[in-house]
Amino acid sequence: MGFTEKQEALVNASYEAFKQNLPGNSVLFYSFILEKAPAAKGMFSFLKDSDGVPQNNPSLQAHAEKVFGLVRDSAAQLRATGVVVLADASLGSVHVQKGVLDPHFVVVKEALLKTLKEAAGATWSDEVSNAWEVAYDGLSAAIKKAMS
């Protein structure tokens, strides 16, 4: 069964919850990443020279919004066509340049889900989590393909 209209709606609703507190949720997202993979700090220009995760950093917030937005867009693509195609072909080369490996995708996925769970609060469910996981997996597969 393909990605459903309901799954897309769940992703869209929780994405809006995430954006309601973009500064706080961005810090939370990168805190979760660094908690699991401290060495990943050097992969992000806005983190590599900072102590911990900087508060109110426009670059950090823009990158978090881009990551979550790409996953949300992937949900829309999966619903419409059943496949994720990168709108920005340079995503593969950027990830190669930064030294991103398969385990990094797992860390980011876990951080994304934990952040969304915090943002969504009582509306979070296994169904919401599953919708985001499917969309994220579609996006990560497209990025990995572009990396090879």
From Swiss-Prot:
Q: Where in the cell is it found?
A: Cytoplasm, Cytosol; Nucleus
Sorted keywords for this record are: Cytoplasm, Heme, Iron, Metal-binding, Nitration, Nitrogen fixation, Nodulation, Nucleus, Oxygen transport, Phosphoprotein, Transport
Q: Where is the Globin domain?
A: 2-148
Q: Where is the signal peptide?
A: none
What does the PTM comment state?
A: Nitrated in effective nodules and particularly in hypoxic conditions; this mechanism may play a protective role in the symbiosis by buffering toxic peroxynitrite NO(2)(-). Nitration level decrease during nodule senescence.
The primary site where this protein sits is: cytoplasm
Q: Tell me which residues bind heme b.
A: S45, K66, H95, K98
Residues engaged in binding O2: H63
Location of Phosphoserine modifications: S45
Question: Which PROSITE patterns does UniProt cross-reference here?
Answer: GLOBIN, PLANT_GLOBIN
- Gene Ontology molecular functions: heme binding; metal ion binding; oxygen binding; oxygen carrier activity
InterPro entries with a match to the protein in the record? Globin, Globin-like_sf, Globin/Proto, Leghaemoglobin-like, Leghaemoglobin_Fe_BS
The cellular component terms of Gene Ontology attached to this UniProt record, alphabetical and capped at eight, are: cytosol; nucleus
Q: Does the keyword Signal apply?
A: no
Q: Name one GO biological process term.
A: nodulation
Q: What Pfam families does this protein map onto?
A: Globin (PF00042)
Nitrated tyrosine modifications at: Y30, Y136
Tissue distribution: Stem nodules.
Q: How does it assemble?
A: Monomer.
Name the family the entry cites: Belongs to the plant globin family.
Function, in words: Leghemoglobin that reversibly binds oxygen O(2) through a pentacoordinated heme iron. In stem nodules, facilitates the diffusion of oxygen to the bacteroids while preventing the bacterial nitrogenase from being inactivated by buffering dioxygen, nitric oxide and carbon monoxide, and promoting the formation of reactive oxygen species (ROS, e.g. H(2)O(2)). This role is essential for symbiotic nitrogen fixation (SNF).
Q: What is this protein called?
A: Leghemoglobin 2
Gene that this sequence comes from: GLB2
